[in-house]
Amino acid sequence: MFRHIFTLGPRSISAITVRSRRALSSTAKPVSAPVTSDDRPNLDVKHLKHPTKVPQQPHKSDIDRRQEPVPRISVDDQTVQLLERLSLVDLDSKEAHRTLEDSIEFASRILAIDTDGVEPLYTVLEKQKLALREDVVSDGNLQEDVLSNARITEEEYFVAPPGNIPLEQDSSGNKHKQ
């Protein structure tokens, strides 16, 4: 049986596949060893089937932040209560209000960016090879195995827990389920 251990290094992820404890020899690097530039995979774009659309150099922004300051947006209590009810997130603290206002300010900034003619990015890891598994044909009769993973079943179906139920707020400010 295989077990994958992932360690985060500076700007890369290295994976070590361990078959058993005996498979590790004294020459193997410990998992906690720092990742060096020699450990990183050599990724050459030329051999890729599809050339990358990710720019290799950062793009200089045309927007001067000093020239166009975004005004600080204040959110009133009625809007906060509506957002709390719709998103099921409690925004009672000052830090939550500040995070909400910062998010709105960030969205206002990126709204001004011209994206005409820019192809959508479908992954940030275009240069990484995906590990594909072999297709194994089976009889497909795995219903009992699949249903054994469910906590609660009813006849031949999974029973899902109830979803997020929005909270209604009465006139006194107390929140309760509908």
Swiss-Prot record:
Keywords recorded for this protein, A-Z: ATP-binding, Ligase, Mitochondrion, Nucleotide-binding, Protein biosynthesis, Transit peptide
Signal peptide segment: none
UniProt EC number: 6.3.5.-
UniProt-annotated stretches for the region Disordered: 26-67
Subcellular location: Mitochondrion
One GO cellular component term: glutamyl-tRNA(Gln) amidotransferase complex
Keyword Transit peptide: yes
Family annotation (SUPFAM superfamilies): Glu-tRNAGln amidotransferase C subunit (SSF141000)
One example GO MF annotation: ATP binding
A Pfam family it matches: GatC
Catalytic activity: L-glutamyl-tRNA(Gln) + L-glutamine + ATP + H2O = L-glutaminyl-tRNA(Gln) + L-glutamate + ADP + phosphate + H(+)
Family annotation (InterPro entries): Asp/Glu-ADT_sf_sub_c, GatC
Summary of the function given for this chain in its UniProt record: Allows the formation of correctly charged Gln-tRNA(Gln) through the transamidation of misacylated Glu-tRNA(Gln) in the mitochondria. The reaction takes place in the presence of glutamine and ATP through an activated gamma-phospho-Glu-tRNA(Gln).
Alphabetized HAMAP family for the sequence: GatC
Family stated for the protein in its record: Belongs to the GatC family.
Quaternary structure note: Subunit of the heterotrimeric GatCAB amidotransferase (AdT) complex, composed of A, B and C subunits.
Name of the molecule in the record: Glutamyl-tRNA(Gln) amidotransferase subunit C, mitochondrial
Organism from which the protein derives: Aedes aegypti (Yellowfever mosquito)
Taxonomic path: Eukaryota, Metazoa, Ecdysozoa, Arthropoda, Hexapoda
